[in-house]
Amino acid sequence: MSTVTTPSAPKVGFVSLGCPKALVDSERILTQLRMEGYEVVATYEDADVVVVNTCGFIDTAKAESLEVIGEAIKENGKVIVTGCMGVDASVIRNVHPSVLSVTGPQQYEQVVNAVHDVVPPRKDHNPLIDLVPPQGVKLTPRHYAYLKISEGCNHSCSFCIIPSMRGKLVSRPVGDVLDEAKRLVKSGVKELLVISQDTSAYGVDVKYRTGFWDGQPVKTRMTELCQALGSMGVWVRLHYVYPYPHVDELIPLMAAGKILPYLDIPFQHASPKILKLMKRPAFEDKTLARIKNWREQCPDLIIRSTFIVGFPGETEEDFQYLLDWLTEAQLDRVGCFQYSPVEGAPANLLDAAIVPDDVKQDRWDRFMAHQQAISAARLQMKIGKEIEVLIDEVDDRGAVGRCFFDAPEIDGNVFIGLDDGSTVQPGDKIMCRVTDADEYDLWAEML
């Protein structure tokens, strides 16, 4: 008697680099491959082909991408490259000529077709037996997910090359966004992190046209989108918010508990001169007034931001202006980067003095020390307060979670001691009382 053997599923390795927006691209590619019967494996040696989703935002990210591509070639040999760095394929092929395919961001079908060329899907594959969840393959923990609402950006910040890599703003249909959010919530997601290159510009490209969701008209606009997301009973957190005037409309939704009182606004600098060189909004005095007004309307509001020090033309006076502005603004969560020139960025052509590396480092150190003192003082005010915590991890030492003012990966944590026999699991929301704080994290006891 002859034995019939069933061919094994083709295996794909996947490395996703860069920002949450790239992570969502990776999830979309992996979902399509899983629907076609591919198995996703965790090691190079087990894979029939490896896909590397690259980051090309700054030169250090490009260097990391090239290093990972080289590692994949060495360990596996069959490598497909996609993502932001793939916009200029020659940069990759000059270093790694053996890569099988190079595509740019959002070119999902081309990536999948490239995988087909290397290792075709099984002809007898039945997509009905794969059990790919309705929300697709997710690379985040089960209890939170990134919700990408648009691609591209209409701004021309002089330090950035995102528009050249991802194009102009293209908003997703509001009904599609809300359908995806609903599927994620149904699958157990407790927190939706709304992302794009410019979240607050959502709908500008389609003139805020009216779409439909659940049979009701909904404008393709940030405020209306947040109102709808706020009806789903989960945390809704906004990232990459450009400080347009209509952002003011979101504050009442936060005060009413519809969405989290958390704004991630990359101010980048405060000096009017540097903001002008960056081609960013240069109304720092009005920004301070807006922050004050926002906090009057929503006292719990948490503001996160990022800044660049050492930008061409930045003087000690400009830097001190930034420190003074931080003192006035009293931001809660802040990141800082030393300026790094990016190939193709307009800032490279500025007629402005280059800041020496040692001065950049000194200013970064001073910036971080200055902001740490502000952050520590603001977190000290949380001691004794009751907070709701979303649990991310549980081990024999206790639980690690986040409250409404902590985004995953980039902000602080809440550390909670647990009694023996505790049933707390990742994804649970529990009430706690804050007992201690430092400049980044909180410690709390379960109520």
From Swiss-Prot:
Gene Ontology CC, one term: cytosol
GO MF annotation list: 4 iron, 4 sulfur cluster binding; aspartic acid methylthiotransferase activity; metal ion binding; protein methylthiotransferase activity
EC nos: 2.8.4.4
Binding, [4Fe-4S] cluster 2: C153, C157, C160
Gene3D superfamilies: Methylthiotransferase, N-terminal domain, Nucleic acid-binding proteins, tm_1862 like domain
Positions that bind [4Fe-4S] cluster 1: C19, C55, C84
Annotated ranges, domain Radical SAM core: 139-377
Cofactor: [4Fe-4S] cluster
Top-rank taxon: Bacteria
Gene Ontology biological process terms, A to Z: tRNA modification
Xref: SUPFAM superfamilies: Radical SAM enzymes
Catalysis: reaction(s): L-aspartate(89)-[ribosomal protein uS12]-hydrogen + (sulfur carrier)-SH + AH2 + 2 S-adenosyl-L-methionine = 3-methylsulfanyl-L-aspartate(89)-[ribosomal protein uS12]-hydrogen + (sulfur carrier)-H + 5'-deoxyadenosine + L-methionine + A + S-adenosyl-L-homocysteine + 2 H(+)
Annotated Pfam families: Radical_SAM, TRAM_2, UPF0004
Domain MTTase N-terminal: 10-120
Role played: Catalyzes the methylthiolation of an aspartic acid residue of ribosomal protein uS12.
HAMAP family: MTTase_RimO (MF_01865)
Membership in a protein family: Belongs to the methylthiotransferase family. RimO subfamily.
Designated name of the protein: Ribosomal protein uS12 methylthiotransferase RimO
Organism field: Pseudomonas syringae pv. syringae (strain B728a)
Lineage: Bacteria, Pseudomonadati, Pseudomonadota, Gammaproteobacteria, Pseudomonadales
